[in-house]
Regions:
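Short coil/turn segments at secondary-structure boundaries
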Residues: 21-30, 120-121, 193-196, 213-220, ...
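A structural connector/turn signal
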Residues: 47-53, 126, 138, 250-251, ...
Length: 373
């Protein structure tokens, strides 16, 4: 259906700044995927500064814009009559006679909007790039009648419900893989089945990723970064990864190969450190960022599908932390201390076949989830 499009500036105006002072309001945090949430629910505690007097009060149905905006961190406040947010956030009043706050939120978080922000950002440092306010307000927003907006919102809600059910099925399939692994091989750290073990680095080598500069140019190449790991176990289409500009093509040691395993080496989020993914770039030249470590096998004692599950086991991740990795870093010395159980290769291959079949089911669920996204 064709809609009229109007500039965002005709729908929102800057709100009057109201500070928290000594008021008692819930602290709200912005998220990429769920908009505004109660901070104590997101982090299981309030992590805001003890002094929130300078925080901004945001009322129900006001628009909150965070940064970097190209990550979609903006939302209509729809969870409390009033809450407080970081003083760095921008707050706008929405003309509700023209547009429903929830409809506006979806319009400003859609792919077309994100691409607009990315194309218009100014500045040289990635996470400090800003979108000039006049440019933001010039963005064209679809504006059907209010009745049609309500219908669109209802369709989005129904699609989200289907997607959530699909994701539940995917999580159950992940649990099935973990259960099958434990059934066949036991816990890789406790090694109650008494498999022979080998140090991880006796079976392969590690390489830290590339550091590059935003003013480099000349060669465009796909690059695996921390933000691309998500909940993946395998990345097989590296052509879909973001590209970076380099002055020259990286040396072969910085190019990923099929069956490589890449770890998150450094991140502010402890849960991300040590996360691993197997990559299969095929013929697509692909490098990896300096916040990652690449592991490359040179022995067939273990196969990648088995080894990846060993490295993803909770007990193995905990061992990484316990042997020298602090909250934000993993290093090659820590990886060298990991002992890997080596069961018979036929068992590893049986497990790999099982994972392949389960992954086919996961891909089917993901495909249908995308259809309703």
């Amino acid at each position: 259906m064709a809609y009229n499009y109007v500039e965002l500036g005709s729908l929102i105006t800057p709100s009057k700044t109201v500070r928290c002072g000594d008021g008692d309001y819930p602290v709200l945090s912005m998220t990429m995927h769920n908009g505004l949430v109660f901070q104590d629910e997101k982090f299981k505690k309030v992590i805001a500064s003890k002094d929130t007097s300078d925080y901004k009060v945001v009322y129900r149905n006001q628009l909150v814009i965070s940064f970097p905006i190209d990550e979609g961190v903006l939302a209509a406040q729809r969870i409390a009559d009033a809450g407080i947010v970081s003083p760095a956030y921008g707050i706008w009043d929405i003309d509700q006679s023209k547009i429903l706050p929830e409809f506006l939120e979806y319009a400003l978080r859609c792919d077309r909007a994100i691409q607009y922000y990315k194309a218009k950002l100014r500045g040289s440092t990635a996470r400090r790039r800003t979108l000039p306010t006049p440019t933001l307000l010039a963005f064209k927003v679809p504006l059907p009648c209010l009745e049609e907006q309500e219908k669109v919102i209802d369709r989005i809600h129904r699609a989200q419900s289907v997607k959530e059910k699909r994701n539940e099925q995917i999580n159950k399939l992940d649990d099935l893989i973990r259960a099958r692994f434990v059934e066949m091989f036991g816990d890789p750290v406790a090694n109650e089945k008494r498999w022979g073990t080998r140090p991880l680095l006796s079976m392969g080598t590690c390489k830290n990723g590339m550091n590059f500069h935003y003013d480099d140019y000349g060669v465009e190449i796909n690059c695996l970064g921390v933000g691309d790991f998500k909940d993946y176990s395998i990345i097989s289409n590296t052509a879909m990864l973001p590209t970076v500009s380099l002055n020259e093509m990286p040396s072969p040691e910085y190019l990923l190969q099929d069956d490589d395993i890449v770890f998150v080496r450094s991140n502010g989020n402890k849960k991300m450190v040590g996360r691993s993914v197997a990559v299969y770039p095929g013929t697509v030249p692909t490098t990896f960022s300096g916040f990652c470590i690449r592991y490359r096998r040179y022995t067939d004692a273990v196969i990648t599908p088995y080894l990846l599950r060993v490295l993803k086991a909770d007990s193995m991740r905990q061992q990484m932390y316990g042997r020298g990795a602090n909250i934000q870093n993993l290093n090659q010395q820590t990886l060298s201390s990991l002992d890997i159980p080596v069961p018979p290769k036929t068992m590893q291959e049986q497990f790999a076949d099982f994972v392949t079949q389960v992954d086919k089911s996961k891909q089917a669920h993901k495909y249908f989830s995308k259809l309703v996204a």
